[in-house]
């Protein structure tokens, strides 16, 4: 949109991690300028987003909160919004939604909230989920528009009493990619890939148990696991399970990587054995864009993306035997992995691109701006 002054938008984010929701924020900052919007960030926590993001040209304000209700920060953000004439506030987490509601009330700038996953099913700690869900529900009352990344999350908001005229379902999207998968022939070792911020709800323990079952039955499989762990304690727990299952020589832990293409080239298929708390996993879309068949679970937004038997195979959550059975079909060549990968790649191009995501978000912004 050359010749048009871009509309300034402030995204309030946590900034602690660089995982799926942060990939959405990053891609929006890269793609929204083509739609006439200039993104800035305000990070409410110290973390890795500032250094790992691709959108290094987007201004970033590091304003860590001193407490969960930091009125000083809200006043500081309100001054920033007025000084830089931000026209939209876009929030992404329960924490940022609470701050955003207060800043919107102070400035009169409309707030948009992006629901990336169900707050009530985000961690294994029930009390924390309940607290975050209550904070989010209260905070969202101040949002003019609510963006959900999947139909399952849209239904959740409707069940909570939010009206349809405020909700817009905009699926996540990722850049299109060349086909990167490794070809597989039955009889060779099958490399299963998983990319995640490893935390309990991602189900890595279930995948390890499934691999142990497969190896016990004589199947040749290994795991290429990419990404950091949420905490050192959780990392120690997972590595100990790997040792107890006798899988130490069959698992590669790479840690965080920036070149996802290089990692996808190591994989024959992609697995995400999520237990709960998924809106629409970005990493599944990225795997599909790379032409990998996907083995995942029947959790919330995942079946909206992966069509069972066409783009991959879906198992019940928290079912190592069911997951092993799905993987075994690839080991034995009972499914056409290449055809599934090609199907998923075309589906991503047609329905889940970064450009279509940005176009949808821009349309929401325009609803809130004066003509």
Q: What feature does the model see in each segment?
A:
Residues 42-43, 284, 293-296, 306:
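Short hydrophobic beta-strand element within catalytic cores of glycosyltransferases
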Residues 265-279, 292:
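Acidic donor-binding loop of glycosyltransferase active sites
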Residues 308-309, 313-320, 329-335:
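Conserved acidic donor-binding segment of nucleotide-sugar-dependent glycosyltransferases
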């Amino acid at each position: 949109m050359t010749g048009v002054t871009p509309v300034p938008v402030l995204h309030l984010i946590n900034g602690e991690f660089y995982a799926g929701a942060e990939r959405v924020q990053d891609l929006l900052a890269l793609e929204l300028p083509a739609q006439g919007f200039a993104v800035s960030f305000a990070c409410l926590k110290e973390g890795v987003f500032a250094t790992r993001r691709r959108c290094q040209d987007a201004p970033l304000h590091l304003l860590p909160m001193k407490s969960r209700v930091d009125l000083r920060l809200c006043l500081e953000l309100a001054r920033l919004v007025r000084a830089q004439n931000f026209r939209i506030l876009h929030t992404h987490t329960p924490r940022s939604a609470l701050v955003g509601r207060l800043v919107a009330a102070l400035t009169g700038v409309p707030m948009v909230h992006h629901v990336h996953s169900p707050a009530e099913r985000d961690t294994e700690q029930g009390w924390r989920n309940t607290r975050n869900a209550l904070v989010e529900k209260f905070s969202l009352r101040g949002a003019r528009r609510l963006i959900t990344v999947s139909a399952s999350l849209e239904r959740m908001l409707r069940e909570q009493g939010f009206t349809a005229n405020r909700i817009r379902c905009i699926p996540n999207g990722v850049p299109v990619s060349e086909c990167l998968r490794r070809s597989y022939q039955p009889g060779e070792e099958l490399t299963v890939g998983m990319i995640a911020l490893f935390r309990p709800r991602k189900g890595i323990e279930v995948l390890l148990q499934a691999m142990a079952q497969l190896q016990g039955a004589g199947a040749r499989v290994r795991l290429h696991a990419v990404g950091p762990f949420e905490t050192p304690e959780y990392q120690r727990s997972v590595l100990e399970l790997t040792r107890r299952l006798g899988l130490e020589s069959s698992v590669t832990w790479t840690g965080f990587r920036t070149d996802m293409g290089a990692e996808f080239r190591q994989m024959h298929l992609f697995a995400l054995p999520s237990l709960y708390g998924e809106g629409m996993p970005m990493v599944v879309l990225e795997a599909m864009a790379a032409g990998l068949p996907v083995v995942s679970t029947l959790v919330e937004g995942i079946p909206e993306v992966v069509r069972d038997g066409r783009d991959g195979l879906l198992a019940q959550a928290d079912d190592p035997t069911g997951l092993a059975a799905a993987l075994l079909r690839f080991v034995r060549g009972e499914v056409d992995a290449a055809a599934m990968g090609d199907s998923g790649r075309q589906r991503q191009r047609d329905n889940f691109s970064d450009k279509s995501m940005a176009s949808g978000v821009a349309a929401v912004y325009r609803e809130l701006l004066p003509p």
